[in-house]
Design a protein with these regions (language model features):
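A broad, low-specificity signal for short, low-complexity segments enriched in glycine/proline
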Residues: 1-2, 66
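Short, Lys/Arg-enriched N-terminal segment that forms or immediately precedes the first helix
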Residues: 2-17
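Small-side-chain structural scaffolding
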Residues: 12, 16, 33-36, 56-64
Length: 72
């Protein structure tokens, strides 16, 4: 369950955020992609918890698993 991911059009232009903290899921995913560990992210951004980072990764995996179709 992704109960820490929020989508609100009034926060970060509707981008998915972590608990409406104005830290976007894509930002956390970029940090992970750059090699940061969950511990390092939480240390740099103390308002986050490790579970926030894990749920951001799960959300990214869920989006990547969605089937898309090309425009015909």
């Amino acid at each position: 369950m992704l109960n820490r991911i929020s989508v609100d059009p009034r926060v970060c232009v509707g981008k998915p955020t972590i608990r409406s903290l104005r830290i976007t899921v894509d930002f956390v995913l970029k940090l992970l992609g750059d090699g940061y560990t969950a511990d390092e992210i939480v240390q740099e951004y103390p308002e986050l918890e490790k579970e926030d980072v894990y749920q951001a990764a799960k959300y990214g995996a869920w989006l990547a698993s969605e089937t898309t179709s090309g425009i015909v």
